[in-house]
């Protein structure tokens, strides 16, 4: 709806085959979707598909709801993402990377690029076994140390957050 309402140019990155197939049906000229994941490291990795055929989200982490099937997918770093789309900054970075957000946020590369990001919408996956709420608290503190302030948080789920740049 941001594309229709405001004419935004949107770049999407998703390694999930079903998500790519859906994006192709939209036929939207201001939407460019790449069948790539975003991670703290570039390369290829096993990406675990959802066990429920009605679900779309897979993960790099093998959890109880994913993992019966997997595909090998290509991942890029945020620096490579910017190079690919020909931009030097990100106005809004939306991350829903199914548990891989913690490594990405704590990477040296993310810290170096943080001043070039104006806002971040992120879904944290602390409900997953082996992650826990402490990982999200640590990530929020880290984002604050990088100059971001929390502008919004979902009270219902306590998993979706929006951060905006407050300082460099």
Where are the model-predicted features located?
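Phosphate/nucleotide-binding beta-alpha loop and adjacent structural elements of enzyme active sites
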Residues: 1-168
């Amino acid at each position: 709806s941001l594309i229709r309402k405001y004419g935004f140019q949107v770049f999407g990155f998703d390694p999930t085959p079903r998500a790519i197939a859906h994006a192709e049906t939209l036929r939207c000229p201001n939407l460019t979707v790449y069948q790539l994941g975003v991670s703290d490291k570039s390369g290829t990795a096993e990406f675990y598909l959802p066990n429920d055929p009605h679900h779309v989200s897979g993960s790099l982490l093998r959890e109880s709801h994913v993992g019966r099937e997997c595909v090998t997918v290509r991942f890029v770093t945020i620096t490579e993402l910017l190079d690919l789309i020909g931009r030097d900054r990100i106005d809004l970075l939306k991350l829903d990377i199914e548990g891989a957000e913690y490594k990405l946020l704590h990477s040296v590369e993310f810290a170096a690029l943080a001043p070039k990001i104006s806002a971040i919408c992120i879904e944290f996956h602390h409900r997953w076994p082996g992650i826990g709420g402490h990982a999200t608290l640590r990530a929020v503190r880290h984002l604050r140390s990088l100059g971001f302030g929390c502008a919004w948080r979902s009270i219902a789920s306590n998993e979706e957050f929006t951060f905006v740049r407050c300082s460099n």
